[in-house]
From Swiss-Prot:
Keywords: Acetylation, Chaperone, Cytoplasm, Endoplasmic reticulum, Isopeptide bond, Phosphoprotein, Stress response, Ubl conjugation
Induction: By heat shock and treatment with the HSP90 inhibitor 17-demethoxygeldanamycin (17AAG).
Changes after translation: Phosphorylation at Tyr-223 enhances binding to chaperone HSP90AA1.
Residues in cross-link Glycyl lysine isopeptide (Lys-Gly) (interchain with G-Cter in SUMO2): 203
Name this polypeptide is given: Activator of 90 kDa heat shock protein ATPase homolog 1
Organism: Mus musculus (Mouse)
Upper lineage: Eukaryota, Metazoa, Chordata, Craniata, Vertebrata
Task of the protein: Acts as a co-chaperone of HSP90AA1. Activates the ATPase activity of HSP90AA1 leading to increase in its chaperone activity. Competes with the inhibitory co-chaperone FNIP1 for binding to HSP90AA1, thereby providing a reciprocal regulatory mechanism for chaperoning of client proteins. Competes with the inhibitory co-chaperone TSC1 for binding to HSP90AA1, thereby providing a reciprocal regulatory mechanism for chaperoning of client proteins.
Localization annotation: Cytoplasm, Cytosol; Endoplasmic reticulum
Modified positions (N6-acetyllysine) in chain numbering: 3, 212
GO biological process, one term: maintenance of unfolded protein
Alphabetical list of InterPro entries matching this protein: Aha1 (IPR036338), AHSA1-like_N (IPR015310), ASHA1/2-like_C (IPR013538), START-like_dom_sf (IPR023393)
Length: 338
């Protein structure tokens, strides 16, 4: 745990604008233990991995001992969390044989980075050997570690609200300091599909783009990735908030992407109003995602209408890099496992 007066400068704020207790140490403490318990259970129980040997999933959280809290001392946020965790997992081979096992995480604490958290996987007593253990130790542990990272990230975003007041210059401090969406170039797989420029929304020239990508997962799982807050935060590596219902709002990638869901059909279709922060005020594109089952794989068809014409290539690159490649790298949906 960080020492008093030390820590990440992103969490340090200036003297308070209201001058309250400016020259004294002032404590504000928030207990995050109950929230952490539910958040960790949700994240761990969502872990599922699969390859040609079969599939594995976390089925039970049978021990979750510890506590979490946040302290604000004169503008410095100090996070404390310490957990000992035991999970049960079940593996099912392609032939239908089931295996039981355990996961132990003895040192999830603020004193360890995500990479330093120990995660051990084992078979239950008297279970025969199976190659599914290797699947769980490699891909399962990867997703468990990502779940730990999401927990830490959301702890530092959801529970800091209201704990730091505006600074003397009237500005608030961004407690996370995540990078904004960048505009590096990358080669998209699909060729441009332009429509004739036409005015829409706030009368600007617009165009249409289409992209197709194949993911090595089911439509059900890929749909969850786009509609579950924790999973969106995982593949964007930044805070996000979303309500996956018709009319539900979303914002992600440090507020650079915002919008509203207009239609959702689980495992089949998502339609949304969508915009970059840099676009003209009030202008949204219409994005449609169609999920097509391809015998264990999913073909995702993305169509974007009303894209500002000067933003066509940036939007295409953003979807290819931050959505498609981000999802594949985070969840392992881009390459077969042998």
């Amino acid at each position: 745990m960080a020492k008093w007066g030390e820590g990440d400068p992103r969490w340090i704020v200036e003297e308070r604008a209201d001058a309250t207790n400016v020259n004294n140490w002032h404590w504000t403490e928030r207990d995050a233990s109950n929230w952490s318990t539910e958040k960790l259970k949700t994240l761990f129980l969502a872990v599922r991995v699969e390859n040609e040997e079969g599939k594995c999933e976390v089925t039970e959280v049978n021990k979750l001992d510890g506590e979490a809290s946040i302290n604000n001392r004169k503008g410095k946020l100090i996070f404390f969390y310490e957990w000992t965790i035991k999970l049960n997992w079940t593996g099912t081979s392609k032939s239908g044989v089931q295996y039981k096992g355990h996961v132990e995480i003895p040192n999830l604490s603020d004193e360890n980075s995500v990479d330093e958290v120990e995660i051990s996987v084992s078979l239950a007593k008297d279970e025969p050997d199976t190659n599914l253990v290797a699947l769980m130790k490699e891909d399962g542990v990867k997703l468990l570690r990502e779940a730990v990272g999401i927990y830490i990230s959301t702890l530092k975003t959801e529970f800091t609200q209201g704990m730091i007041l505006p600074t003397v210059n009237g500005e608030s401090v961004d407690p996370v300091g995540q990078p904004a969406l960048k505009t590096e170039t990358c080669k998209a797989k699909s060729a441009p599909s332009k429509s004739q420029a036409k005015p829409v929304g706030v009368k600007i020239p617009t165009c249409k783009i289409t992209l197709k990508e194949t993911f090595l997962t089911s439509p059900e799982e890929l749909y969850r990735v786009f509609t579950t807050q924790e999973l969106v935060q995982a593949f964007t590596h930044a805070p996000a908030a979303l309500e996956a219902d018709r009319g539900g709002k979303f914002h992600m990638v440090d507020g650079n992407v915002t919008g509203e869901f207009t239609d959702l059909v689980p495992e089949k279709h998502i339609a949304m109003k969508w915009r970059f922060k840099s676009w003209p005020e009030g202008h949204f594109a219409t994005i449609t995602l169609t999920f097509i089952d391809k015998n264990g794989e999913t073909e995702l068809c993305m169509e974007g209408r009303g894209i500002p014409a000067p933003e066509e290539e940036r939007t295409r690159q953003g979807w290819q890099r931050y959505y498609f490649e981000g999802i594949k790298q985070t969840f392992g949906y881009g390459a077969r496992l042998f």
